[in-house]
């Protein structure tokens, strides 16, 4: 079994003011720095440092944002306030940190795409209501070493399931990705790892993704849906999530220390997907996934215990940092 030495609290990545209501807004935001260390899969392969040590820019307009995040030189881009624009995803360069200064830092109507890049950090950023024609809220394709942390991604469920696309989709053989401390909510098809049943040649042996300390709320499906790769889902709270964790097409998942409330299918397989379940509270649902073989991870981490997840995650996941 994994040696659980990594301490979430010491890394400054999880704990803060805790609220019980279904919201991700903390009364007291936690101060963070651009040098905070990535964890999970994003800590491997040399680690993920983003733009630390590079140039620093603060933006508050669409034009300034698109310009600031381009190119592969090391850079830290702070988003100050809400930027509204109906547009396709903005492509992010390698060695980039995109940081929301506070809970008001939101991209509305357009998302971001990390494609054929490496070493990217997206933290404390809100992304909302990106139409399907304009892509995902956050997309990762053909890329490695990406850390998505303390973000708030959402749309609404007032439209049909195809009005918006994914909130966080990780595809085309991407590796060493961590999604952590993020509020994922009010959406039909939330988070996809592996985009197609026919993409085995590209995805097999890749798609190594950690989901940790996340709050999933009012989601219909894909929390996440995982094809072909290797995934770790732990310390997360699920409320009103119909179809939760779906392992499929040979994926191997380790699912630990999660709590599900009002879920129809908490953990399940399709097309020969596999999972190992450890200390999960499935509520009125159950684990129907085929038994897998993934019992340890190549990094250190600490499990909160399913009974403690709600208190630790709700009110802390999401845009609860300040910079």
Curated annotation (Swiss-Prot):
The active site is at 222. Pectinolytic enzyme consist of four classes of enzymes: pectin lyase, polygalacturonase, pectin methylesterase and rhamnogalacturonase. Among pectinolytic enzymes, pectin lyase is the most important in depolymerization of pectin, since it cleaves internal glycosidic bonds of highly methylated pectins. Favors pectate, the anion, over pectin, the methyl ester. It comes from Aspergillus niger. It comes from the Eukaryota. One of its GO terms (molecular function) is metal ion binding. Glycans are attached at residue 95. GO terms for biological process: cell wall organization; pectin catabolic process. This is Pectate lyase A.
């Amino acid at each position: 079994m994994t040696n659980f030495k990594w301490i979430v609290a010491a890394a400054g990545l999880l704990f803060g003011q805790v609220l019980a209501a279904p919201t991700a807004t903390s009364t007291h935001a936690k101060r963070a720095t651009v040098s905070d260390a990535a964890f999970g899969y994003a800590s491997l392969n040399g680690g993920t440092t983003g733009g630390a040590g590079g140039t620093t820019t603060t933006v508050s307009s669409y034009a300034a944002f698109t310009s600031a995040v381009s190119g592969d030189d090391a850079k830290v881009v702070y988003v100050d306030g809400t930027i509204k624009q109906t547009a396709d995803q903005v492509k992010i360069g390698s060695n980039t940190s995109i940081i929301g200064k506070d809970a008001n830092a939101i991209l509305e109507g357009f998302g971001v795409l990390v494609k054929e890049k490496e070493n990217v950090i997206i933290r404390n950023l809100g992304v909302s209501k990106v139409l399907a024609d304009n892509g995902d809220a956050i997309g990762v394709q053909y890329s490695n070493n990406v850390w998505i942390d303390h973000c708030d991604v959402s749309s609404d469920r007032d439209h049909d399931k195809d009005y918006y696309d994914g909130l966080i989709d990780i595809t085309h053989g991407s590796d060493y990705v961590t999604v952590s401390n993020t509020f994922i909510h009010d959406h039909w098809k939330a988070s996809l790892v592996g985009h197609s049943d026919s993409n085995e040649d590209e995805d097999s042996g890749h798609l190594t993704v950690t989901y940790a300390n996340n709050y999933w709320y009012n989601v219909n499906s894909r929390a996440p849906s995982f094809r072909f790769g290797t995934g770790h889902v732990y310390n997360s709270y699920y409320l009103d999530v119909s179809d939760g964790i779906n392992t499929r097409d040979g994926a191997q998942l380790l699912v630990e220390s999660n709590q599900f409330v009002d879920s129809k299918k908490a953990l399940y397989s399709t097309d020969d997907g596999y999972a190992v379940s450890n200390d999960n509270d499935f509520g009125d649902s159950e684990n129907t996934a085929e038994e897998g073989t993934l019992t340890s991870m190549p990094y250190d981490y600490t499990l909160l215990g399913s009974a403690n997840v709600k208190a630790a995650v709700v009110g802390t996941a999401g845009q609860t940092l300040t910079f």
